[in-house]
Structure formats: C-alpha cells, structure tokens
Curated annotation (Swiss-Prot):
Catalytic reaction annotation: thymidine(out) + 2 Na(+)(out) = thymidine(in) + 2 Na(+)(in); cytidine(out) + 2 Na(+)(out) = cytidine(in) + 2 Na(+)(in); uridine(out) + 2 Na(+)(out) = uridine(in) + 2 Na(+)(in); adenosine(out) + 2 Na(+)(out) = adenosine(in) + 2 Na(+)(in)
Protein localization: Cell membrane
Species, as recorded: Eptatretus stoutii
Protein name: Solute carrier family 28 member 3
Membrane topology listed for this record: Multi-pass membrane protein
Length: 683
C-alpha cells in the first residue's frame, strides 16, 4: 500500500518509468509521433528535429502550395486550350486532311505548270512522272468503282469461251501462227535472214524444255503462249516502235543520271580519286544507294503497288496462281532472296510446281539493286530495263512447261494476297535500313568477284599448262565454253563470228556469276567504242552492236551455281519443313531460269535492229570480209568519216567518233572523190 501511495497521487513528484518512456499523445497527434505511428520507434530521427526547421518547412510548404495552385490554374488553361483543338481536329479530321492535301496538290500542279512554261525541256521528266501518276490514280478509282460490274458483265463471254474453248483455241492458235509467219516473211524480206534464226532458236528451246518436262502431258499451253506473247508485245513496243524505244532510252538516261548522285557519297568517303579504283569505289556504292531508294519506296507502298499491278496482268493473261505471279513481278524490282518474302505467309502452302516457279523466276531476273551497278559498267540501261521486264513472263512460261502443275493451288484468288508495308517507323529509318541491308550484298559481290576471278585465273593457268604439252598454250576455260556453248549463242541470233565470244560470256555467267560476264562484256563494248583493232594476236577484241545487245539479254539473270546455293538456303530458312521439296527443285529451276534468259535473248534477236554504228561497220564489213553488204550504209558511213576527219599534214590526221586511219584508207579505196584521198598515206 505504501509503495502504491508513494507512486500515486499522494506523491506527485514521482514519475513512473513506464510513463516516462511514452511520448506525449498530443504531440503524436500533431507531429504524427507516438503509438498512433509505430514507425516512429523504428526511425525516430525522421520525426524529430529542430523547431526552427519545422517552422521554416511549414512556411516553405505554404509557399509551394500557393505556387502549385497557380501552376495548376495555368496547366488547366493550357489543357483546356489544347483539348479544344484536339476535339476540333477529331470532329473535322477528314475535312482538314482533304484541305491540306488539296492545297499541296494545287501548289504542286502550279509548280509543274510554271516549270513547263519557263523551261519545258528541263521539266519533261517531272511532267511525265506527274501524268503517269494521274493516269494510274484515276485508273485505280475506275477499277475500284466499276471493276466488279465489268467482271459481272463479262461473265457470259467467259462462260461461252470456257464451254467452247476446245474448238475456239484452234482458231486462235491458227491466227497466231499465221501472224507469226506473215511477220517473219515481211521482216525477213526487209531486214534479211538475221531475224529468222532466233525465231527457230526460240522454238528449239521450248521443244527442249517440253521434251525434258516433269509431266509433258500436263503442260498448260495457255501459260506458254501468253508468256511468249507478253514477251513479244513488250519487246515489240520497246524495240520496234519509236515511242517505246525513245521512252526506254529516255528512262535509261534518267536512271543513269539518278545513279550518278552516288558519286557524291563516294567522293566524300574515298576522295576525289575514287574512280581510280572504279569497281570498288564507284560501282559497289551504287548498290548501297539503290538499295536505300528501294527500301524507301517499299516503306511508302510504291513497290507493293507496282508489284501488284504487274502480277495482276500476268495472272489474268497467263492464268498462273497469284503466288507465282506476285513473285515473278517482284523479281523485276527486287532480288531472288527478297521476292519470296512478298508471299512469306503462303510459302508453306505452295505446290511443288509453284515452288519451282518461284525459284525459276529468281534465276531468270536480276535485282534492281545491282541493275545500277551493271549500268555503271557501261552496259546499255535501256537493254537491261527491257530484259528485266521481258524475263518475268518468260520465267513463268518456261518453268510451267518444265514442271507443270498437277495439283490445285490453295490460294487461287488475288484477293487472298496482302502485301505488307515496311515495318520501319518513318522514312529516315527505312532509308537507313536499306543502306544497312546492302552491306552484306556488297560484301558478297566483292568477295565472289575476288574468289571467282582468282579461280578463273588458276583454271586458265592450269589449262594453259596442259595445252602447252600439245603446243597449244592458248587453251583456257573461255575457249572450252566458246565451243561447247557456241550453238546456244548462235541460235539466239548472234552473228557467227561473234557467237564464240558470246558463248564465253554465257560460260562465265553460268559457272561463276553474271558480274564477271558483264565486266567482260563491258570491256568488249569499250574496245568497240574506242575504235581499236578488231584482232590482237589473233584474238577478237569486240563484237557487233547487235551481238552486244543479244548478249545483254542472255546474261540478265541470276542463273548460276553460286545463286543456286543462295536460293536453296534462303527459301529453306523461310519454309524449313519444305526443305526437301526446295532442294529437289533446285537444278531444274536453274535450267529453267537459264533457258528463260535465252528465250528473252531470242525475242530480242528477232526484234532488235541496231542503229548504224559506222566504226564497227567499217571495220567488220570492209576489212574483215573484204566485201560490202549494204552499199548505202557504207557510203553513209564513209561520208561521216570524211566529215569527222581533220588532216593538217599527211602524218597529222585526227578523227572523232571512233574512226581511224585504216578506215579512212578503206573508204578512199571505194570513194576516192569524197575526200582528199591523194594526200592520205596508206598504212
């Protein structure tokens, strides 16, 4: 009891030690300390501090709250303003878009019209591109609105043809055969027999493909006839009509001009003397530039639009499946490994005949990215562009003859195909991605050229060593190819004397790659244009312009053994469970792609008529054969030679356009009155 009293109210000075340890509850309410806030006991320093500091922080908090209130008011006003703009845009989105687009179009058309008024010649390219874009824009609108109605209206005609095609087809085939015979008769009477040989060469190649076909009885001749007909129509428009020839020549010049902009990057990176190492520093950078442009076009959807249009044309005429048509059209613009990506979701469902067709199309054409490189070597751009277009239907025709379809395609309508746009976020990323994607391609080209040229040199050295044992040290890989492949070159319409050189190029392209062959062809072109001697140590140095053109078409494809491995590897990675089917198609697809290129060359041989190139005519006609074929051409060329000759003294004579003293002496023999020939000293 006393102890209790000692600790009770009777002893107010006494402090209970337990009570002493407890904090003031009023303080706990104010400062968040005490039993109501158990974390205080764990970290009391967080809640205890100087009273002055507490007062100061309270003042700061009040000021911050006032600032936050002011800032919140401003933010609310800004948010309200932008919210109003956003809502207005959402309500009038279409009107704003169309208004903005209309203003852009009005400004663009005003620019085009003003440019044409000020300088029509310089504005021609812009005008042509604008008119083409307008035409296809309204064409798409027309088809979108009336396409189904037109198809519905034509259904009775289609039904009638399907029911009576077994009879009608003989009239169609007879009319086509009669037209071909009349064409060849009239053309041969006018041009000579050079155009007849490639026609029979084309028939020979088709017969060979048919004889060795996988299923000869299953060949659909509609595909073959329409494929060849599309080839012929494309070639006729481009090679025989002046508007078509001028258009593709103009297009070739524009492409060459466009590719010249690559020099800016090459000069910056490699210096002003970059062309001293022409192939490495001038040709290969073009591949990077072209790949960049193609990637940008793909991002914008232009490539997909072009591919769909060309693929649609081949599908409705030839009757091939949408998959085959799209890949064949895509190969005009992209490479053999990129074009299958267009139908990547459908690769697993392709029939084996469709797979063979996809591979054949890749072998029969070249990629747009390397097209510029070939042009930079001096290969005529118009011929390369024409060959790229003509080989697309040829690949389908030959491949479907070599391996006909025996099953029904799972994707038989064009509406089942959807070509995706690029996955890049913007145009700059697309350009960067395209440039980066070209780096492995450039490295692959450079590595293959180094390897193949080295291997070719070794093979030639070995063959020369073997040949020297029989007193024939000239024996080489080129000579073997020139004799083995000479009949194929001759049947394309190449002159007999040039067929051995073209056969060499075919061998290089098939066993090495087309870059090696085109590089050698560019040397022949340069030798001819420089007006050098036709023979050096008994070796022919160049060929005729017509033979160069036919060779350009025959070489325009990836059909070589190196590409075979690339094709099988690329397709196998896209469709792993179809690897055995892909491998089984490989060799046949390679042969089909090669013959497709040959058929394109045959069509070119039938249609192509070279412009009169006087230095070549004078060298080959006057001094190789000793007789003239066309006196009118000879006289015209000699007249041009006399006009281009400047004679200061008998020993000081200058020429232009590839002429030389040998040609002058020859022309003086035939037309002595046309020039002061008495002053010319014979060589």
């Amino acid at each position: 009891m006393s102890a209790f009293k000692a600790r009770g109210v009777e002893n107010p000075s006494y402090e209970d030690p337990d009570e002493k340890q407890k904090p003031d509850l009023e303080m706990s309410k104010t400062n968040g300390i005490g039993v109501d806030n158990p974390s205080y006991y764990k970290n009391p320093e967080k809640y205890l501090g100087n009273e002055n500091e507490e007062g100061k922080s309270n003042n700061d908090n009040e000021e911050e709250e006032e600032g936050e209130e002011d800032q919140g008011a401003v933010e609310r006003c800004v948010n309200k303003f932008y919210g109003g703009i956003h809502n207005f845009y959402k309500r009038n989105k279409k009107i704003i878009h169309y208004t903005f687009l209309g203003l852009l179009l009005v400004g663009y058309f005003a620019l085009v019209i003003a440019a044409c008024i000020v300088n029509f010649k310089q504005s021609l390219a812009l005008l042509v591109l604008t008119l083409i874009a307008i035409f296809f824009f309204f064409w798409d609108l027309f088809i979108a609105k009336y396409g189904d109605k037109i198809a519905e209206a034509l259904k009775p005609c289609q039904k009638f043809l399907d029911n009576h095609w077994s009879i009608i087809r003989w009239f169609v085939y007879g009319a086509l055969l009669l037209a071909v015979i009349l064409w060849l008769t009239l053309d041969t009477a006018k041009r000579g027999a050079n155009q007849v040989i490639p026609f029979f060469g084309l028939i020979l190649y088709i017969l060979l493909v048919f004889i060795f076909s996988k299923h000869p009885t299953k060949v659909r001749w509609r595909i073959v006839i329409w494929g060849l007909l599309l080839q012929f129509i494309f070639g006729l428009i481009i090679l025989r009509t002046k508007p078509g020839l001028d258009a593709f020549n103009w297009l070739g010049i524009q492409v060459q001009t466009f590719l010249k902009y690559t020099d800016a990057g090459s000069r910056f990176l490699f210096g002003d003397d970059f062309q001293d190492h022409f192939f490495a520093f001038a040709v290969l950078p073009i591949v990077i530039f072209f790949s960049t442009v193609m990637s940008m076009m793909y991002y914008l959807g232009l490539m997909q639009w072009l591919i769909l249009k060309v693929g649609w044309l081949m599908q409705i005429t030839m009757g091939t499946s949408p998959m085959e048509s799209m890949v064949s059209a895509g190969n005009i613009f992209v490479g053999q490994t990129e074009s299958p990506l267009l139908i990547r979701p459908y690769l697993a469902d392709l029939t084996i005949s469709e797979m063979h067709s996809v591979m054949s199309s890749g072998f029969a054409t070249i990629a747009g990215s390397v097209l510029g490189a070939y042009i930079s070597l001096g290969i005529p751009a118009a011929h390369l562009l024409t060959a790229s277009v003509m080989s697309a239907p040829a690949a389908l025709a030959i491949s479907k003859t070599f391996w006909p379809e025996t099953k029904k395609s799972k994707n038989s309508t064009q509406t089942s195909i959807k070509l995706e746009k690029g996955q890049e976020n913007n145009l700059v990323e697309a350009a960067s991605q395209g440039a980066s994607a070209a780096v492995p391609l450039v490295a692959n080209i450079a590595a293959n050229l180094i390897a193949f040229l080295a291997v070719l040199a070794f093979i030639n050295a070995t063959l020369s060593w073997l040949g020297s044992m029989f007193n024939y040290p000239q024996f080489s890989f080129e000579i073997i190819c020139s004799y083995v492949l000479m009949p194929f070159a001759f049947m394309m319409g190449v002159n007999y004397d040039d067929s051995f050189l073209v056969a060499e190029l075919l061998g290089m392209k098939t066993f090495f790659n087309e870059f090696v062959a085109y590089q050698r062809l560019s040397e022949y072109i340069h030798n001819r244009e420089s007006g050098g001697p036709l023979f050096v140590d008994g070796v022919r140095q160049y060929m005729s312009v017509r033979s160069e053109a036919i060779a350009t078409y025959a070489l325009c494809g990836f059909a070589n053994f190196g590409s075979l491995g690339i094709m099988i590897g690329g397709l196998s990675s896209l469709a792993p469970h179809r690897k055995s089917d892909i491998a089984s198609c490989g060799i046949r697809a390679l042969i089909a792609g090669t013959i497709a290129c040959f058929s394109t060359a045959c069509i070119a041989g039938v249609l192509y008529i070279p412009e009169l190139y006087c230095p070549n005519l004078l060298m080959s006609t006057l001094f190789e054969n000793g007789t003239t074929v066309n006196t009118t051409n000879l006289m015209s060329c000699c007249t041009d030679l006399f006009k281009s000759t400047t004679m200061l003294t008998p020993k000081n004579i200058t020429f232009t356009e590839g002429f030389n003293t040998t040609m002058l002496n020859g022309c003086c023999t035939f037309f002595p009155s046309g020039f002061n020939c008495s002053e010319v000293r014979p060589e």
